[in-house]
UniProtKB/Swiss-Prot annotation:
Name used for this protein in its record: Carboxy-S-adenosyl-L-methionine synthase
Main function: Catalyzes the conversion of S-adenosyl-L-methionine (SAM) to carboxy-S-adenosyl-L-methionine (Cx-SAM).
Enzyme class: transferase
UniProt gene name: cmoA
Source domain of life: Bacteria
The species this protein was found in: Escherichia coli O17:K52:H18 (strain UMN026 / ExPEC)
Database matches in Pfam families: Methyltransf_25
Length: 247
């Protein structure tokens, strides 16, 4: 059962950097619904994309799976035999709860839930890879290497779903969407103190890129096609496709 997020409702004397610890994992479903505009839509549509792209006898990777929402959405929409989902996260608290969530919903497609570093996992025989609000937590210097590895591990015709919080090259637009996101959080019951304290904890950990930067990286990795398919304020998701005739 998810609890309401009140982690930052009282002043915290020493704000450290953000971590996905036990306290965050406990309230994560409530936190993300009230903090990330369009999150439910992205999760449900990841399942729709899975129905289009997952092929028999292949693997799906959910890199940075948190509590397994994207994994479950994918699994509900796989209608082929001999598929497997590999869900990985480096937070022990998230992985523990993810395993519970996966086990609670029975389905034919097996899921390997792994506690580990997404930078170290091999990507093989993949028809789909999901990076759902994960890349932004890697050091910028490490992002291209991960995308390169994903491209190499995708089968021809495979898809990468990349959801992120965005920065904007147009400062005026960036300011507007930043403020609208804060309005969204206020409308969902977060106080100015909660918004401010969470932002302070995230600012050194979550480093955002522009859509243009994401597209440039995807192109460099080898993806022939990439486009923004969903956006709400400064959050959104891209899909990148490996050509069917790729070597």
């Amino acid at each position: 059962m998810s609890h309401r997020d009140t982690l930052f409702s009282a002043p915290i004397a020493r704000l450290g950097d953000w971590t996905f610890d036990e306290r965050v994992a406990e309230v994560f479903p409530d936190m993300i619904q009230r903090s990330v505009p369009g999150y439910s839509n992205i999760i449900s549509m990841i399942g729709m994309l899975a129905e289009r792209f997952v092929q028999p006898g292949t693997q799906v990777y959910d890199l940075g799976c948190s509590l397994g929402a994207a994994t479950l959405s994918v699994r509900r929409n796989i209608h082929h035999d001999n598929c497997k989902i590999i869900a990985i996260d480096n937070s022990p608290a998230m992985i523990e709860r993810c395993r519970r969530h996966i086990d609670a919903y029975k389905a034919p497609t097996p899921v390997d839930v792994i506690e580990g570093d997404i930078r170290n996992i091999a990507i093989e025989n993949a028809s789909m890879v999901v990076l759902n609000f994960t890349l932004q937590f890697l050091e910028p210097s490490e992002r291209q290497a991960l995308l390169d590895k994903i491209y190499q591990g995708l089968n021809p015709g495979g898809a990468l779903v990349l959801s992120e919080k965005f920065s904007f090259e147009d400062a005026k637009v960036g300011e507007l969407l930043f403020n609208m996101h804060h309005d969204f959080k206020r409308a969902n019951g977060y106080s100015e103190l909660e918004i401010s304290q969470k932002r302070s904890m995230l600012e050194n950990v979550m480093l955002t890129d522009s859509v243009e930067t994401h597209k440039a990286r995807l192109h460099q990795a080898g993806f022939e096609h990439s486009e923004l398919w969903f956006q709400c304020f400064n959050f959104g998701s891209l899909v990148a496709l490996k050509a069917e005739d790729a070597a």
